[in-house]
Amino acid sequence: MKDGCTSQKVNKQRSIPLPVLKNPPAQKDEIRSSRSSWWRAAALITLTLLMIAHIIQWRLMGRTISPIEPSEAMYTLQNGAVNAGFIFFTLAILATLIFGRFVCGWGCHILALQDFCAWLLKKFGLTPKPFRSRLLVFVPLIVALYMFVYPTVYRYFAKPKNEPLIPQFTNHLVTSEFWATFPPVFVAIPFLFVCGFMTVYFLGQKGFCTYACPYGGFFSLADKVAPGKIRVTDACNQCGHCTATCTSNVLVHAEVKQYGMVVDPGCMKCMDCVSVCPNDALYFGFGKPAIGVPKTIKKNYSLTWTEEFAAAFVFLASFLAVWDVYQLVPMLMALGIATITTFLAMRTWRLFRVKDLSFYRFNLKSSGGIRQAGWIFLSFALVWLGLNAHSGFVRYHESAGARAFENIKIPDELALARTNPARWLSASDVQNINEGKKHLYTAVNASLLVNSTVLPKLAWIEYLSGNTEQAVNFLAAASEHQQGQAKALSFYYRGAILNRLGRYEQALTSLDQALAEQSDLVLAREERGESLWQLGRKQEAVSAWNDAVQSNDNLVLANNLLAGAAVSLGKSEAAAAYEKQADQFTPADPLFHWVVGLRLQNVGMNALAEKHFGRAIQLNPEFRKARN
């Protein structure tokens, strides 16, 4: 120790302890429950019950108000059939022009299913995350234009000059065929599952509304000019409760801050944001519409621009692959499937491109390695995408075969006049028969389900090819999977072919089945009379032909058959009257005369047959070659 330095004893500590106070419990910034959601749930449940009651009433009484479904408006625009769906859709658009897009939020059964699915997922701790795309949001509008505008535009350019743009309106408010425009029940159930549940799981709440609902395409446009909006007062403190509770995936807090109102056309006026606002700063009111307001809020999207174009391609390919495949998948279901396919394809792409990827609370990939959840997701995605590709393969061959079938020009009446119509087939017909057979057989052999419209086409192609037994078998198989008019026609064609083969008892059974399905099918009555005549039951045959004439006294063949029957039974005056009636409506067409002659010759009415053969040759001497 240096001289002069003395040790000093520190008597006090240099740091002073401060008293520690207990913190008060932190205030929980909880979002209060929405009172509006309960009212909306009640409205949607009531709507669902009314829909069920509507179906029950139709099943019990046989007649009811036509479906209150916007797609029914297509038949009004195309055929002039004014129905309940057209009236509802018109009123809904008009209401949206004033109040905004509230019909979707409070009056749509598909949205009710989506909300129910989201509620279930949250019960399992899974909160649907919105899939945001720049391009796919235009799908609903494009489809709406295709459904409701394109037919009128096409008619404008294609219609004859003397026809009106829109056909004369007729009253179709009441119908006995309530389900005629809907898919079968076994398709409707998976349709509701795909569009009401799966779209929510993969695309977020209201995923179907955002990317697949064509009616929403028009409602979104109407919402832009509607004065009714969710608006804000100065009491807003940007807590974000509104955005957190919005089930339409709208950035409510950001939009009301920037624009003073919600401008996103996806807002369905559910009123949840208004109900949960802690300061009661939000309200529904009228004022300036959203149109013309510059959109300055930058959104975060799920895809890059390169991925956007890839997603658009995948969506289109998937939609075309599944729409109407097996003659079962309706357009709206195809749109729902395509959105899910697009999500799975893009997420699978990312699974191989990025180091880390999650889906809900599951880690699909971490630090470059695919986890167990990732392999499960990948397996599901590959199965789903594989089924899409398979559907596309089947749909291509169905479509190609159908086009070839439609290009076969030989008239049915001529082909059915004899068992072997080969002599009447043109080179073009032969080519289309071969093309149709190739594509339709490929579709049938690859199909996972039965296409009840392909089988009758194959039956007709086989008949024209001379394979009558195969044609009969295909028509029998088709009838097992058909309903209504389609089933009746399969029974009719089967009966007609069996008549030509001389198997009259079987033909009679098939024709009776056709008439049981559709009692006004007069062609089946004509063929039924032929079966009875050939079986020796002549009075019953005359009765069948009389039934046909009573429904339409202009039937040339039926009147000729009655004339021939009257001659056979010794009733010359009646024969002359029937023949005169037939001649009155017989066109000066050689082919028509020839077909009538062949049909009369089939039942042994040779004198009348020769009369028509002679008239055909007189009109066109080339038919003389057919006698040789």
Name every feature range the model reports, one short phrase each.
Residues V394, N451-T453, Q485-L489, V522-L523, ...:
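Helix-start (N-cap) detector for alpha-helical repeat units in TPR-like alpha-solenoids
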Residues A389-E480, Q506:
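Membrane-interface segments at or immediately adjacent to transmembrane helices
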Residues L464, R500, Q534-L535, S568-L569, ...:
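Register position in tetratricopeptide repeats
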Residues I433, L440-Y441, L475, L511, ...:
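Hydrophobic/aromatic packing residues within the alpha-helices of TPR/SEL1-like helical repeat arrays
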Residues K2-K257, S275, D280-A422, N432:
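Non-ligating segments of multi-cofactor redox enzymes
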Residues A446-S447, H481-Q483, E517, S551, ...:
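Structural marker of alpha-solenoid helical repeat scaffolds
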